[in-house]
Amino acid sequence: MARRKVSIIGAGNVGATAAYYIAEKVIADIVMVDITEGMTQAKALDFLHAGPMRGYDVSIRGSNDFSTIADSDLAVITAGLPRKPGMDRMDLLKVNTDIVKSAAKHIATYAPNATVIVVSNPLDVMCHVAFRTTGFAVRRVMGMAGILDSTRFRYFVAQEVGCALTDVHAMVLGGHGDQMVPLPRFTTVAGVPITQLLDKAVIDRIVERTRKGGAEIVGHLKTGSAYYAPAASVAEMAEAILTDRKTLAPCAVYLRGEYGIENLFIGVPVLLGKNGVERIIELDLDESEMALLNGSAEAVKKGVNDLDTFFVPR
């Protein structure tokens, strides 16, 4: 039986690290595509050299030719530019829209049966770009955000409680930005609600630090952003889809009335399996949680409205 195939478009820090993590899981052969001549080829060869020591034996190929993504089961879009000094939000939106649109066109042409994971920022809006450009079914296009935000939340909780990271289960909904919605009421340590383990002031501080988690890393790096945890999040999603693991995790998906939200990509809990988004889970949110989610949705909607002023899908 042929091994599954993952193609990663954009071989910068997130894309290349995601390729490495997926290789270590030995769940698929990997193609990395980037417009930078020689970079993907070098990284692919470096990964292959590490295989005998790290215990993986998969095909890893680097290319500048988008036709090499043909017949991929999964396509990951990490290509995009970070915001530079002097660049306003709309300029960044236009630049990354063009990049993601180009990637999505190649996916639709060469890998029409693939499931798509979008990583490029602004995440929730770029999901709309990929979805509209590919014309794929909604279950086959999703964004990586909630898993990353939730794992940051889990880490901060574990640090405060002093427990094992794996004992913490957490859920973060909403857009991938300052208005994300960490849910303390759905966060537990070995089944015990964190509200029984931590004071409200501590929980509030953790929630705020989670919202600023990416910015905190950018503040330290000065000239870059996080990539190990985002790449690990991509690898978790890839494994769930390619092995049909039925993982329940928050992802940016297209809502059609769930949570009272229409026609918008936003982070909610879903079941991931071989068909992509196999089920959207509707949590019983209280009034304050729902208000926060609606506020987050409004922020995403503003970005989509900005997109609609210039975007032509095909």
Locations of the language-model features?
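Rossmann-like NAD(P)(H) cofactor-binding subdomain of soluble oxidoreductases
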Residues: 88-154
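Rossmann-like NAD(P)-binding element
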Residues: 53-114
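Glycine-rich Rossmann-fold phosphate-binding loop(s) that bind the pyrophosphate
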Residues: 11-12
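C-terminal substrate-binding/catalytic lobe of Rossmann-fold NAD(P)-dependent dehydrogenases
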Residues: 134-139, 149-287, 291-314
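Conserved N-terminal Rossmann-fold NAD(P) cofactor-binding segment
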Residues: 33-72, 301-312
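N-terminal Rossmann-fold NAD(P) dinucleotide-binding loop
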Residues: 15-16
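Conserved S-adenosyl-L-methionine
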Residues: 24-29, 135-137
